Amino acid sequence: MKPKKIFSALLLSLALVLPVKAEVITIEPLFEYPVSPEEIVTLSDKSNWLMQHFWDNMDFKKKGAVNQSALNDAFKVYSLPMQWAEKAEVDKSVASLLDKIQKNPTLLLQFTKAAESSLYSERADIWIDEVYLKFLDAFLKNKKIPEIRKRRYERQMRQISNSLNGSIAPSFDFTTPTGTPGKFQPIGVFTIIEFGDPDCDDCRHAKLRMETDVRFSSLVERGLVNVLFILPDPVDGWQTKMTDYPANWVTGASDTVSDILDLRLTPSFYVIGKDGKIMEKNVSVDQAMKIAFKETSSDK
């Protein structure tokens, strides 16, 4: 679960107690959003209650499609408390919801789109891969949904499944600017991979941030941190744009890595521990460097 925005205590309370009034809604809601009882005090308990009761007022017996924008809004309100609710309550809530919609392929598709918008897309307030995977799994297993509609989601499921925090980072092939074939594999050294484009302003800023930080550069020079810059899906002439990268970085391009890993941002940073497991993904360069400092603090 990765929160992308910091909410104040006041906004949190408003989002949980008065979810309808917390936002300006220009569409008609599908149903009246529930309000947690006043006697429930803690943020966790309020969130648990909403997981249990959020969809109580929705009519799941209708066979036709619903307004997608309205469903997206409802799902966004539903998903925000997931970051404070107990995992067991979230899992139970999602399982119950999927059970209600699994026999209605139209509604299942719409809910999958809503989950994508609120839990996976770049504009989502939070990313919760484990929950989004549950919707993808149900959607892809539904035999009533045409295969052509599943292709994009099949790719997402493969990328996310390969990239879960705590899992071993998968290997991938790349080519260096000099044409030498390379292969990334976890090597027992703390590693930061920036998947980006030399022409991308944010990517250049991240590169500059790492190479000009004296403390971070020292870790790289001493072999305590391994840094890779990989260009996904390269076009002709990419080699000429990667001539000014630090010599102790591994640089290259890969035309297959975007099919293997979840690279929903540009740049996408992956932080990989000494044990080869993904510690964080799609974080900022500052977050990646902060983890590097923490993980190497005991190394001399």
Give each language-model segment a name:
Residues A22-G182:
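Oxidative protein folding and maturation machinery
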Residues G182-T212, N226-L228:
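Short active-site neighborhood of thiol/selenol oxidoreductases, capturing the structured segment around
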Residues N57-P81, G188, V235-A247, L261-R264:
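Structural alpha/beta surface segment adjacent to cysteine/selenocysteine redox centers
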Residues M242-D275:
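Short, internal strand/loop/helix patches
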Residues L265-K300:
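Non-catalytic, surface beta->alpha helical segment in thiol-disulfide oxidoreductase systems
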Residues E221-G237, P246-T256:
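Thiol-based oxidoreductase modules, predominantly thioredoxin-like and allied folds used
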Residues M1-K5:
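Positively charged n-region of N-terminal signal peptides that target proteins for export
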Residues S8-V17:
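Bacterial N-terminal signal peptides
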